[in-house]
Amino acid sequence: MKLKSKLFVICLAAAAIFTAAGVSANAEALDFHVTERGMT
C-alpha cells in the first residue's frame, strides 16, 4: 500500500512538472488563447 501511494505521488509530481514545462514552452500561445476566449 505504501509503495503504491508513493508511486502515485511521484506520478502526480511528474505530471505537474510536465505540465509546467509545457505551459512555459507555450506561454505566449496559451496567454493569447486565454485572452482571446475571455477566460471563459
Curated annotation (Swiss-Prot):
Propeptide residues according to the Swiss-Prot or TrEMBL record: 1-35
Entry keywords, A to Z: Competence, Cytoplasm, Quorum sensing, Secreted, Sporulation
Subcellular location: Secreted; Cytoplasm; Host cell
Signal sequence region: none
Annotated phenotype, changing G38A: Does not stimulate expression of the srfA operon. No change in inhibitory activity and in sporulation stimulation
Null mutant phenotype: Null mutant produces no detectable CSF activity, but null mutation has modest effects on competence gene expression. Deletion of the gene results in decreased expression of genes activated by ComA, and significantly changes the expression of 66 operons. In non-domesticated strains, the mutant is blocked early in swarming, forming stunted dendrites, with abnormal dendrite initiation morphology. Mutant exhibits a specific migration defect that cannot be trans-complemented by CSF in a mixed swarm.
Induction details: Part of the rapC-phrC operon, which is controlled by the P1 promoter. Transcription from the P1 promoter is activated by high cell density through the phosphorylated form of ComA. PhrC is part of an autoregulatory loop, and it positively regulates its own expression. In addition, transcription of phrC is also regulated by a P2 promoter, which directs transcription of phrC only and is controlled by the sigma-H factor.
Biological process terms in GO annotation: establishment of competence for transformation; quorum sensing; sporulation resulting in formation of a cellular spore
Effect of T35A: Slightly increases transcription of the ComA-controlled gene rapA. No change in CSF levels
Function per UniProt: Signaling molecule that serves as a cell density signal for both genetic competence development and sporulation. Secreted during production, but the mature peptide acts intracellularly, indicating that it needs to be imported into the cell to function. At low concentrations, CSF stimulates expression of the genes controlled by ComA, a transcriptional factor that regulates the development of genetic competence. It includes the srfA operon, which encodes a small protein, ComS, required for competence development, and the surfactin biosynthetic enzymes.
Official protein name in the record: Competence and sporulation stimulating factor
Organism (species): Bacillus subtilis (strain 168)
